[in-house]
Amino acid sequence: MKIINTVQEMQQITNELRASGKSIGFVPTMGYLHEGHATLLRKAREENEIVVLSVFVNPLQFGPNEDLDRYPRDIDRDENVAKENSVDYLFYPSVEEMYPAEQTTTVEVVKRTDVLCGKQRPGHFAGVAIVLMKLFNITLPTRAYFGMKDAQQVAVIEGFVADFNIPVTIVPVDIVREEDGLAKSSRNVYLSPEEREEALHLYRSLCIAKERIETGERNAEIITTLVKEYIETYTKGTVDYADLYAYPSLQVVDKIEGRIILAIAVKFDNVRLIDNITLTVK
């Protein structure tokens, strides 16, 4: 595995790889890699000749009161995970390397961002779109891999790739969970033992809702109320949202049909957790 720190060197390598006909699988991350990221890397390894991993904590996608400085970082750990999963190139640029001057151009995402996490994080998805536009141009991937834990991000990325005719296939990968059901997240390290136990009820609430839908419930409000009340009953967390939308359009639905997403965000003392399920309802 080779570690690359500059845009120029990474671009030169990927240009040469694509010119020689090699397929490139790209996994963009903010580091502190866990089994969820490793699953993306293994999928990329299976489907491509070359695997490129980026580790970059992108300041543009953090709001003024968000946890940029607290976001966990451990490049030694990340290198080990990369090597264990047969990564060919680890792209690890500094903020100054990625943003050497103030941006003169931005990307405004106008659909799929005014609900779920986007509703409470204005500018977040613009920051995501900017860094991905840069990373796609630097790494020239054939395929790029994203976890469905942030399903809204996947929907936004699929939309902006289609809008700008970016020649990359977006590959969504199912949420990776702990054995007890908790969705793997770099932020789980901030949970107290009590919160860690309570956090199990997030996925349980989604499973209960899924069972209700599969046994015939089609009223979206009944389902979201059930999820919210369950979480409020069994945890001390604050429910930011428990919402149901068509997916990937993220349009409001009253009647549950077609492909839908049921998504939740719950704030504990020091960490905000998200989770979701997607399913197709006939």
Swiss-Prot record:
Pfam families, A to Z: Pantoate_ligase (PF02569)
Location, primary (coarse class): cytoplasm
GO CC terms, sorted: cytosol
Family that this chain belongs to: Belongs to the pantothenate synthetase family.
Transmembrane segments: none
Oligomeric and partner information: Homodimer.
Binding positions ((R)-pantoate): 61, 153
Residues annotated as catalytic: 37 (proton donor)
Pathway: Cofactor biosynthesis; (R)-pantothenate biosynthesis; (R)-pantothenate from (R)-pantoate and beta-alanine: step 1/1
Role: Catalyzes the condensation of pantoate with beta-alanine in an ATP-dependent reaction via a pantoyl-adenylate intermediate.
GO BP: pantothenate biosynthetic process
Residues that, per the record, bind beta-alanine: 61
The keyword Cell inner membrane appears for this protein: no
Stated name of the protein: Pantothenate synthetase
HAMAP family linked: PanC (MF_00158)
GO-annotated molecular function: ATP binding; pantoate-beta-alanine ligase activity
Reaction catalyzed: (R)-pantoate + beta-alanine + ATP = (R)-pantothenate + AMP + diphosphate + H(+)
Alphabetized UniProt keyword annotations: ATP-binding, Cytoplasm, Ligase, Nucleotide-binding, Pantothenate biosynthesis
The protein's Enzyme Commission number: 6.3.2.1
Subcellular location: Cytoplasm
Residue sites binding ATP per the record: 30-37, 147-150, 176, 184-187
Note: The reaction proceeds by a bi uni uni bi ping pong mechanism.
UniProt key word Lyase: no
